Amino acid sequence: MSLFSAKSQAALNLFVHSNLTENNIVSKSEYNPSTGVRTFGYENVDGNWSIGLGGFGSIPLPGKKFSLRLGLNNSYARSVGFVGSERNNADNWTLREELTLAYRFGRLDTSLKGMWSHNKIVNSLGSAANNTATNDYGLHWDTQISLPLNLALESQLRYTSMNGYASGYNYDQTLVNIGLSYSFLKGKVATLRFKVYDLLGEQRNVYRNVSALAISSQETNIIGRYAMLHFIYKFNSFSGNASASDMKNVRRGPGGPPPSGRF
Protein backbone atom coordinates (compact mmCIF):
# COMPACT_ATOMS: atom_id res chain seq x y z
CA MET A 1 0.00 0.00 0.00
CA SER A 2 1.38 3.41 -1.00
CA LEU A 3 0.18 6.83 0.15
CA PHE A 4 1.41 10.29 -0.88
CA SER A 5 0.38 13.82 0.04
CA ALA A 6 1.17 16.39 -2.65
CA LYS A 7 0.61 19.20 -0.15
CA SER A 8 3.01 18.02 2.55
CA GLN A 9 5.25 15.93 0.25
CA ALA A 10 4.95 13.08 2.79
CA ALA A 11 5.04 9.51 1.50
CA LEU A 12 4.21 6.15 3.07
CA ASN A 13 4.68 2.64 1.72
CA LEU A 14 3.55 -0.45 3.69
CA PHE A 15 3.90 -4.13 2.83
CA VAL A 16 3.06 -7.52 4.31
CA HIS A 17 4.15 -10.98 3.20
CA SER A 18 3.60 -14.52 4.44
CA ASN A 19 4.53 -18.09 3.58
CA LEU A 20 3.16 -21.51 4.56
CA THR A 21 4.76 -24.88 3.80
CA GLU A 22 2.80 -28.11 4.24
CA ASN A 23 4.26 -31.62 4.31
CA ASN A 24 7.80 -30.30 4.51
CA ILE A 25 10.38 -33.10 4.31
CA VAL A 26 12.80 -33.12 7.28
CA SER A 27 15.43 -35.60 8.43
CA LYS A 28 14.96 -37.70 11.54
CA SER A 29 17.12 -40.22 13.37
CA GLU A 30 16.44 -42.78 16.09
CA TYR A 31 19.04 -44.44 18.32
CA ASN A 32 18.59 -47.91 19.78
CA PRO A 33 20.73 -48.12 22.95
CA SER A 34 20.46 -51.91 23.16
CA THR A 35 21.95 -52.48 19.70
CA GLY A 36 23.93 -49.25 19.28
CA VAL A 37 22.32 -48.73 15.89
CA ARG A 38 21.16 -45.30 14.72
CA THR A 39 18.50 -45.30 12.00
CA PHE A 40 18.13 -42.33 9.68
CA GLY A 41 15.01 -41.43 7.76
CA TYR A 42 12.71 -38.63 6.64
CA GLU A 43 9.31 -37.44 7.76
CA ASN A 44 6.70 -35.01 6.44
CA VAL A 45 5.79 -32.29 8.93
CA ASP A 46 3.47 -29.29 8.98
CA GLY A 47 3.94 -26.07 10.90
CA ASN A 48 6.55 -24.23 8.83
CA TRP A 49 5.29 -20.71 8.22
CA SER A 50 6.37 -17.07 8.30
CA ILE A 51 4.92 -13.58 8.22
CA GLY A 52 6.51 -10.18 7.75
CA LEU A 53 5.37 -6.58 8.08
CA GLY A 54 7.27 -3.47 7.17
CA GLY A 55 7.24 -0.15 5.44
CA PHE A 56 9.02 3.05 4.50
CA GLY A 57 7.99 6.62 5.13
CA SER A 58 9.41 10.08 4.52
CA ILE A 59 8.37 13.59 5.43
CA PRO A 60 10.05 16.94 4.67
CA LEU A 61 10.74 19.17 7.64
CA PRO A 62 9.87 22.90 7.62
CA GLY A 63 12.03 24.69 5.09
CA LYS A 64 12.16 21.63 2.79
CA LYS A 65 15.94 21.30 3.17
CA PHE A 66 15.74 18.57 5.79
CA SER A 67 13.68 15.39 5.63
CA LEU A 68 13.07 12.42 7.90
CA ARG A 69 12.85 8.84 6.64
CA LEU A 70 11.72 5.83 8.65
CA GLY A 71 12.13 2.20 7.62
CA LEU A 72 10.71 -0.90 9.34
CA ASN A 73 11.11 -4.57 8.41
CA ASN A 74 9.86 -7.02 11.04
CA SER A 75 9.19 -10.73 10.67
CA TYR A 76 8.38 -13.97 12.47
CA ALA A 77 9.17 -17.46 11.21
CA ARG A 78 8.63 -20.92 12.66
CA SER A 79 10.67 -23.87 11.41
CA VAL A 80 10.03 -27.46 12.46
CA GLY A 81 12.64 -30.21 12.60
CA PHE A 82 13.88 -33.14 14.63
CA VAL A 83 16.83 -33.26 16.99
CA GLY A 84 17.38 -36.99 16.91
CA SER A 85 13.85 -38.33 17.24
CA GLU A 86 12.47 -35.36 19.21
CA ARG A 87 10.52 -32.65 17.44
CA ASN A 88 11.76 -29.07 17.86
CA ASN A 89 9.96 -25.85 16.98
CA ALA A 90 12.27 -22.89 16.39
CA ASP A 91 10.60 -19.48 16.61
CA ASN A 92 12.65 -16.79 14.87
CA TRP A 93 11.79 -13.15 15.65
CA THR A 94 13.52 -10.40 13.64
CA LEU A 95 13.18 -6.64 14.05
CA ARG A 96 14.95 -4.18 11.73
CA GLU A 97 14.43 -0.46 12.23
CA GLU A 98 16.17 2.57 10.74
CA LEU A 99 15.79 6.35 10.94
CA THR A 100 17.44 8.80 8.51
CA LEU A 101 17.86 12.55 8.68
CA ALA A 102 18.68 13.92 5.22
CA TYR A 103 19.80 17.40 4.18
CA ARG A 104 19.86 18.65 0.60
CA PHE A 105 20.64 22.21 -0.40
CA GLY A 106 22.58 23.61 -3.31
CA ARG A 107 25.66 21.52 -3.99
CA LEU A 108 25.46 19.51 -0.75
CA ASP A 109 23.55 16.26 -0.27
CA THR A 110 24.13 14.48 3.04
CA SER A 111 22.29 12.02 5.29
CA LEU A 112 22.76 10.45 8.72
CA LYS A 113 21.13 7.07 9.29
CA GLY A 114 20.80 5.11 12.54
CA MET A 115 19.94 1.41 12.44
CA TRP A 116 19.05 -1.32 14.91
CA SER A 117 18.48 -5.01 14.21
CA HIS A 118 17.32 -7.56 16.80
CA ASN A 119 17.07 -11.31 16.27
CA LYS A 120 15.78 -13.76 18.89
CA ILE A 121 15.50 -17.54 18.62
CA VAL A 122 13.25 -19.56 20.95
CA ASN A 123 13.47 -23.37 20.77
CA SER A 124 10.87 -25.74 22.20
CA LEU A 125 13.61 -28.26 23.09
CA GLY A 126 16.40 -27.69 25.57
CA SER A 127 16.87 -25.09 28.26
CA ALA A 128 16.61 -21.33 28.13
CA ALA A 129 20.34 -21.27 27.29
CA ASN A 130 19.40 -22.49 23.81
CA ASN A 131 17.33 -19.35 23.25
CA THR A 132 19.74 -16.74 21.89
CA ALA A 133 19.42 -13.11 20.84
CA THR A 134 21.63 -10.79 18.80
CA ASN A 135 21.64 -7.00 18.49
CA ASP A 136 23.28 -5.10 15.65
CA TYR A 137 23.72 -1.32 15.66
CA GLY A 138 24.74 0.88 12.78
CA LEU A 139 25.39 4.53 12.01
CA HIS A 140 25.83 5.66 8.39
CA TRP A 141 26.89 9.11 7.23
CA ASP A 142 26.76 9.58 3.45
CA THR A 143 27.77 12.84 1.76
CA GLN A 144 28.03 14.08 -1.82
CA ILE A 145 29.30 17.54 -2.79
CA SER A 146 29.01 18.90 -6.33
CA LEU A 147 32.15 20.84 -7.24
CA PRO A 148 32.96 23.20 -10.12
CA LEU A 149 34.17 21.78 -13.46
CA ASN A 150 31.57 18.96 -13.31
CA LEU A 151 33.37 17.26 -10.42
CA ALA A 152 31.70 15.58 -7.45
CA LEU A 153 33.15 14.34 -4.18
CA GLU A 154 31.45 11.55 -2.25
CA SER A 155 32.10 9.74 1.02
CA GLN A 156 30.50 7.00 3.10
CA LEU A 157 31.30 6.57 6.78
CA ARG A 158 29.62 3.48 8.24
CA TYR A 159 30.01 2.19 11.79
CA THR A 160 28.64 -1.25 12.74
CA SER A 161 28.52 -3.04 16.10
CA MET A 162 27.47 -6.71 16.26
CA ASN A 163 26.63 -8.30 19.63
CA GLY A 164 25.30 -11.64 20.89
CA TYR A 165 26.97 -13.90 18.32
CA ALA A 166 29.20 -16.91 18.93
CA SER A 167 32.66 -16.31 20.36
CA GLY A 168 34.89 -14.57 17.83
CA TYR A 169 32.01 -13.11 15.81
CA ASN A 170 31.17 -10.10 17.98
CA TYR A 171 32.94 -7.03 16.65
CA ASP A 172 32.86 -3.32 15.88
CA GLN A 173 33.95 -1.99 12.51
CA THR A 174 34.26 1.35 10.76
CA LEU A 175 33.95 1.35 6.98
CA VAL A 176 35.16 4.40 5.04
CA ASN A 177 34.68 4.86 1.26
CA ILE A 178 35.81 7.96 -0.65
CA GLY A 179 35.27 8.77 -4.33
CA LEU A 180 35.79 11.52 -6.88
CA SER A 181 33.81 11.66 -10.13
CA TYR A 182 33.83 13.74 -13.29
CA SER A 183 30.79 14.05 -15.59
CA PHE A 184 31.13 14.99 -19.25
CA LEU A 185 29.51 14.89 -22.71
CA LYS A 186 26.24 16.64 -23.52
CA GLY A 187 23.75 16.36 -20.69
CA LYS A 188 26.49 14.86 -18.47
CA VAL A 189 25.54 11.37 -19.63
CA ALA A 190 29.07 10.01 -19.07
CA THR A 191 30.85 9.81 -15.73
CA LEU A 192 34.32 8.71 -14.67
CA ARG A 193 34.57 7.81 -11.00
CA PHE A 194 37.61 6.82 -8.96
CA LYS A 195 36.65 5.33 -5.60
CA VAL A 196 38.57 3.81 -2.71
CA TYR A 197 36.66 1.23 -0.65
CA ASP A 198 37.28 0.19 2.97
CA LEU A 199 39.99 2.78 3.49
CA LEU A 200 40.70 1.56 7.05
CA GLY A 201 40.74 -2.15 6.11
CA GLU A 202 38.24 -3.12 8.83
CA GLN A 203 35.38 -4.69 6.85
CA ARG A 204 34.11 -8.12 7.90
CA ASN A 205 31.18 -10.13 6.57
CA VAL A 206 29.46 -12.17 9.29
CA TYR A 207 26.04 -13.74 9.01
CA ARG A 208 23.89 -16.10 11.06
CA ASN A 209 22.16 -19.29 9.92
CA VAL A 210 19.06 -20.36 11.86
CA SER A 211 17.10 -23.61 11.52
CA ALA A 212 15.18 -26.02 13.74
CA LEU A 213 18.38 -28.08 14.06
CA ALA A 214 21.11 -25.53 14.76
CA ILE A 215 22.21 -21.91 15.02
CA SER A 216 25.56 -21.05 13.48
CA SER A 217 27.59 -17.90 12.84
CA GLN A 218 29.81 -17.79 9.76
CA GLU A 219 32.25 -15.35 8.20
CA THR A 220 32.91 -15.17 4.46
CA ASN A 221 36.02 -13.87 2.73
CA ILE A 222 35.98 -10.35 1.32
CA ILE A 223 38.33 -8.39 -0.92
CA GLY A 224 39.30 -5.85 1.75
CA ARG A 225 40.78 -2.46 0.96
CA TYR A 226 40.72 -1.75 -2.79
CA ALA A 227 40.22 0.99 -5.39
CA MET A 228 38.13 0.99 -8.56
CA LEU A 229 37.82 3.17 -11.62
CA HIS A 230 34.24 3.28 -12.93
CA PHE A 231 32.89 4.42 -16.26
CA ILE A 232 29.16 5.17 -16.22
CA TYR A 233 27.09 6.06 -19.27
CA LYS A 234 23.40 6.96 -19.12
CA PHE A 235 21.52 5.89 -22.23
CA ASN A 236 18.61 8.06 -23.38
CA SER A 237 16.26 5.96 -25.52
CA PHE A 238 13.21 8.23 -25.36
CA SER A 239 11.72 9.35 -28.66
CA GLY A 240 11.47 12.93 -29.87
CA ASN A 241 12.88 15.61 -27.63
CA ALA A 242 11.82 13.89 -24.40
CA SER A 243 14.48 13.27 -21.79
CA ALA A 244 14.79 10.93 -18.86
CA SER A 245 13.89 13.79 -16.50
CA ASP A 246 10.72 14.45 -18.54
CA MET A 247 9.65 10.83 -18.16
CA LYS A 248 10.43 10.94 -14.45
CA ASN A 249 8.13 13.93 -14.02
CA VAL A 250 5.34 12.11 -15.87
CA ARG A 251 5.73 9.04 -13.70
CA ARG A 252 5.94 10.90 -10.41
CA GLY A 253 3.76 13.88 -11.15
CA PRO A 254 4.57 17.40 -9.94
CA GLY A 255 6.61 17.00 -6.79
CA GLY A 256 5.65 13.34 -6.57
CA PRO A 257 7.31 10.73 -4.40
CA PRO A 258 10.12 8.44 -5.41
CA PRO A 259 9.22 5.05 -6.90
CA SER A 260 7.55 2.64 -4.50
CA GLY A 261 9.89 1.31 -1.85
CA ARG A 262 12.68 3.83 -2.49
CA PHE A 263 13.28 6.96 -0.43
Predicted region positions:
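Exposed, low-structure sequence patches enriched in small/polar residues
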Residues: S2-F263
